[in-house]
């Protein structure tokens, strides 16, 4: 991702036949996505201006200037939209943007290295932090205060308290 860009929204499926579409806003107040001017694709090749927006169940329904048909809206499904960081308000103490965490070392409360923050996901049930250990599969953990008790941007790390029980596949043992 180009330096200084923050993803603030993702376009979803069309809504109706006149070019409206679902939009998932990643701003604290969903309608604030309209306050940051034109939104661009990650590579900066395309730029979009929100013409109208209204809240829906867990997303916004928006129209974009220049998008007038369902077919045009369908072609945009899944696009992430970015703004330069300097258009966003500064963070307050204890606040951060998800982009600030990507690449930070993840350590245990004892200071032992676990890996690096690879991504923050949200599949609908809350934020998930993805940790890439030095070897092996990535860890997908709930981004909660219990699992991530400390985000220290000054020290440049996150503290991860690994859950004592992690559900997963267990080997089948035939009964003897």
UniProtKB/Swiss-Prot annotation:
Cited Pfam families: PRC_RimM, RimM
InterPro entries in alphabetical order: PRC_barrel-like_sf, PRC_RimM, RimM, RimM_N, RimM_N_sf, Transl_B-barrel_sf
Keyword Cytoplasm included in the entry's annotation: yes
Stored SUPFAM superfamilies: PRC-barrel domain (SSF50346), Translation proteins (SSF50447)
GO CC term (a single one): cytoplasm
GO molecular function: ribosome binding
Main location: cytoplasm
Subcellular location: Cytoplasm
Keywords (A to Z) from UniProt: Chaperone, Cytoplasm, Ribosome biogenesis, rRNA processing
Keyword Lipid metabolism: no
GO biological process, one term: rRNA processing
Domain PRC barrel span(s) in chain numbering: 93-170
Annotated domain remarks: The PRC barrel domain binds ribosomal protein uS19.
NCBIfam families assigned: 16S_RimM
HAMAP family (UniProt xref): Ribosome_mat_RimM
Summary of the function given for this chain in its UniProt record: An accessory protein needed during the final step in the assembly of 30S ribosomal subunit, possibly for assembly of the head region. Essential for efficient processing of 16S rRNA. May be needed both before and after RbfA during the maturation of 16S rRNA. It has affinity for free ribosomal 30S subunits but not for 70S ribosomes.
Family indicated by similarity: Belongs to the RimM family.
Assembly information from the UniProt record: Binds ribosomal protein uS19.
Protein name as annotated: Ribosome maturation factor RimM
Species: Rhodopseudomonas palustris (strain BisB5)
């Amino acid at each position: 991702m180009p330096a200084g860009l923050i993803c603030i929204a993702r376009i979803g499926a069309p809504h109706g036949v006149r070019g409206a579409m679902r939009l998932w806003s990643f701003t604290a107040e969903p309608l604030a996505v309209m306050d940051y001017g034109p939104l661009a694709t990650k590579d900066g090749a395309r730029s979009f201006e929100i013409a109208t927006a209204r809240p829906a169940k867990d997303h916004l329904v928006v129209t974009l200037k220049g998008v007038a048909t369902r077919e045009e809206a369908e072609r945009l499904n899944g696009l992430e939209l970015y703004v330069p960081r300097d258009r966003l308000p500064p963070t307050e103490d204890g606040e951060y943007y998800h982009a600030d965490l990507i690449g930070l070392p993840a350590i245990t409360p004892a200071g032992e290295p676990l890996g690096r923050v690879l991504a923050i996901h949200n599949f609908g049930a809350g934020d998930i932090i993805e940790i890439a250990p030095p070897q092996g599969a990535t860890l997908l953990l709930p981004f909660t205060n219990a699992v991530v008790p400390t985000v220290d941007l000054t020290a440049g790390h996150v503290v991860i308290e690994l859950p004592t029980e992690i559900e997963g596949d267990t080997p089948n043992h035939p009964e003897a």
